[in-house]
Structures are given as structure tokens and as C-alpha cells.
């Protein structure tokens, strides 16, 4: 159900897809779909939770904090540059090759222009969120190495921009 709904959201946009359309695509009735999910928003929330869960797993596997700095500042002070590189590679493969991640990203890209909520989510997941995360990691790495970075924000932009560009080109 989630994969089918997300595929439809990625092609037509979240707002344009009805529960009836999802049920029709699956060959089931709306009533059968409502036995699993309360509504379309519930389906979206389950998709988002799954995407977040996978992000936590990739973070742990790569040795980087799985939450924001405000939630676990101590974890940011122990990250190695290699761990950040490994994480970014894993992120690129995930966001460019995984069917769920690709469709989630495509849906957010479409919906960011139609809804302030989706625009904020797009920023958090794909633009300002990763940028702030990388900036915080770079700041903590420089503290540990006792080196002052001229502009952690500018360095984070330089680090993240190729990732974002290549991700956009992968479509």
C-alpha cells in the first residue's frame, strides 16, 4: 500500500491523489484500505516514518549522529571525517537508487510549490536540514582538531552542493 501510494504521490503529487485512486491502483476497495490506514494523511505519515527510520539506520551504520545537534550534541564531537564521507555516499545511493527514497524526494519536489508544509519538509529533508547538520559536524570536527574554520556555513555549502546537484541530475 505504502509503495503504491508513494509512487502515485511522486507522479501526480500528494494533493492530487485520492484514497480512491490508491485503492483502485491496488485493486481493492476504499473500505479495505481504511482497515489499514485512517486516511491519506496516515499513509503519508507512515511513509515519512519509514524514511526517517532508514535514515537513522544509515547514520548509525556510518558512525554519524542520527539526530540533530540539539538532541545529542555529545555525539557530534566524536565524528571522524571518514564517517561523514561514508554517510554522504550512503545518502547519495539511498536518495538516488532506493525506490521509496526516490519517490519520496520526487513527491516533495512537486509538492514544495503547492504547500507551505511540504515546502518546509522539503527544506528540512533535502536542503537546510542536511546543510545545518553538516555545518554542525564540521564545527565539532574543527573544535576537536583545534583548527578554526573561516566559515563553517560556507564550507558546509561547498561540501553539500555537489551532493545536491548530483542528486538532482540523477533523475
Predicted region positions:
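Hydrophobic alpha-helical connector segments
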Residues: 46, 59-101, 148-159
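Solvent-exposed, amphipathic alpha-helical segments
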Residues: 4-12, 90, 104-107, 162-169
Amino acid at each position: 500500500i505504502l509503495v503504491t501510494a508513494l509512487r502515485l504521490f511522486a507522479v501526480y503529487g500528494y494533493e492530487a491523489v485520492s484514497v480512491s485512486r490508491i485503492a483502485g491502483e491496488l485493486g481493492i476497495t476504499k473500505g479495505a484500505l481504511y482497515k489499514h490506514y485512517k486516511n491519506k494523511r496516515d499513509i503519508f505519515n507512515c511513509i515519512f516514518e519509514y524514511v526517517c527510520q532508514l535514515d537513522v539506520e544509515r547514520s548509525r551504520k556510518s558512525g554519524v549522529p542520527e539526530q540533530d545537534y540539539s538532541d545529542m550534541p555529545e555525539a557530534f564531537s566524536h565524528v571522524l571525517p571518514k564517517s561523514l564521507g561514508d554517510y554522504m555516499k550512503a545518502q547519495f545511493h539511498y536518495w538516488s537508487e532506493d525506490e521509496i527514497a526516490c519517490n519520496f524526494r520526487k513527491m516533495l519536489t512537486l509538492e514544495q510549490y503547492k504547500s507551505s508544509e511540504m515546502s518546509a519538509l522539503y527544506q528540512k529533508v533535502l536542503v537546510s536540514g542536511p546543510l545545518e547538520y553538516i555545518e554542525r559536524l564540521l564545527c565539532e570536527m574543527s573544535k576537536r582538531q583545534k583548527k578554526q574554520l573561516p566559515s563553517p556555513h560556507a564550507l558546509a555549502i561547498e561540501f553539500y552542493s555537489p551532493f545536491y546537484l548530483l542528486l538532482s541530475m540523477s533523475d
